[in-house]
């Protein structure tokens, strides 16, 4: 995003990176579900659904609280950051100690 100089360019960069992080999250989620027994699989699915609901509500709040011309960028960065952090969290569960 260093080369992005306009709000539109920054938004595009955020969207692109969010898509990459979402693919990463989906990939590790699928890997983890195949590794888990049925009980923990269900727990992961339930937790992941709740996490998505929380992420979306939290980032919507960021947009509302920020206001102004950069509010949408703030919301996009929120989704990006939370998605990246969740992917890393699931990767740590999938491969502890790495």
Annotated model-derived regions:
Residues 1-98:
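N-terminal alpha-helical modules
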């Amino acid at each position: 995003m260093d080369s992005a100089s306009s709000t539109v360019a920054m938004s595009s960069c955020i969207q692109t990176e969010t898509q990459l992080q979402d693919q990463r999250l989906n990939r590790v989620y699928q890997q983890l579900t195949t590794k888990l027994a049925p009980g923990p699989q269900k727990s992961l699915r339930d937790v992941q659904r709740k996490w998505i609901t929380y992420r979306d509500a939290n980032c919507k709040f960021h947009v509302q609280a920020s206001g102004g011309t950069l509010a949408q960028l703030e919301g996009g960065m929120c989704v990006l950051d939370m998605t990246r952090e969740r992917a890393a969290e699931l990767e740590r569960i999938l491969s502890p100690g790495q």
